[in-house]
């Protein structure tokens, strides 16, 4: 397991977050095929270690990292087919995810809306750190 992922998982386990077991590379690649999108390596490292949180659980700042199954569910419900979410704040107050046509990590405030134009982070690893440190940019 990648060191940064190991540190994040350890932190969440200490906090009592209910974490799913990791997924397989095959499942990630199948999702990439369905979404017509290639996830970055840091995202893959994370999901190989944990497939999001269980039972809508969230970490201390109320962010819920989705299992792969929920990523596709939310994508199918969203009107913005350029946005691929992977977590939400306070049970869908807003979403954090990728854009298919732009590098970085973005926010979207409603599944009936479009993601913001400006990225809040450059990498998945960076945004996980921002979420865990409660950066103002994630709200």
Predicted features and spans:
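A surface-exposed partner-binding patch
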Residues: 1-100, 138-139
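Residues at the C-termini of beta-strands that transition into short coil/loop
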Residues: 87, 112, 131
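Segments surrounding the PLD/"HKD" phosphodiesterase catalytic module and close analogs
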Residues: 53, 94-122
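Compact, glycine/acidic-enriched structural inserts
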Residues: 117-133
């Amino acid at each position: 397991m990648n060191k940064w992922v190991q540190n994040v998982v350890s932190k969440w386990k200490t906090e009592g977050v209910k974490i799913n077991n990791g997924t397989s590379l095959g499942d990630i690649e199948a999702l990439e095929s369905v979404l017509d999108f290639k996830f970055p390596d840091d995202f893959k490292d994370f999901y190989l270690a944990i497939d999001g949180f269980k039972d809508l659980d969230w970490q201390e700042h109320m962010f819920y990292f989705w299992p792969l199954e929920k990523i596709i569910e939310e994508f199918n419900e969203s009107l913005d087919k350029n946005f691929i979410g992977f977590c939400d704040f306070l049970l869908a107050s807003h979403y954090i995810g990728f854009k298919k046509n732009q590098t970085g990590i973005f926010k979207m405030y409603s599944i009936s809306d479009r993601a913001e134009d400006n990225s809040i982070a450059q990498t998945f690893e960076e945004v996980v750190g921002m979420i865990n440190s409660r950066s103002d940019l994630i709200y």
